[in-house]
């Protein structure tokens, strides 16, 4: 399984637009399709047109449940994005491992909204997942000092920073 914490397109790495970078990433992910599930938590450069000034994302055009046949055995839920559409921008995956037992991985979009946190909480507390170990995959969680991030300067709203994700 592959887990990545975002930064898929990045305006500081060359001369490609966000769309061109997503297309490049999509070609790379195609090599994994049908082989392993991959879980993407979008970062600050994955949302908005530049860097998290709004909640728009190109991800649903490139990463969706039918794309990778491995999602059929691991993707257990998708949450609504800011438009009210279920996408893999907020997604949950289940894995079973002899050593670790039952695992639920929840991937959040950068600075998740209250609705995404509520959706995840309901999953975690459900009868089906109540006894699972839970991994939360998100972007921009710890600062350089190792402390949870309490505030960032992005204009994105509504949103929750790391400390709010942790306490909710």
Outline where the language-model segments fall.
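Predominantly extracellular/lumenal beta-strand repeat domains
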Residues: 4, 37-39, 147-149
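Active-site micro-motifs of SAM-dependent methyltransferase domains
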Residues: 4, 46-47, 142-143
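Active-site neighborhood of phospho(di)ester-bond hydrolases with catalytic His/Asp-centered motifs
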Residues: 1, 34-43, 108, 135-139, ...
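Extended active-site neighborhood of metal-dependent phosphoesterases/phosphodiesterases
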Residues: 9-119, 128-129
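Generic preference for flexible, low-structure residues
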Residues: 75, 121, 150-152
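Active-site metal-binding motif and surrounding structural segment of the metallo-beta-lactamase
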Residues: 1-8
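Active-site-proximal segments of metal-dependent phosphoesterases and phosphodiesterases across multiple
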Residues: 11-18, 117, 127-168
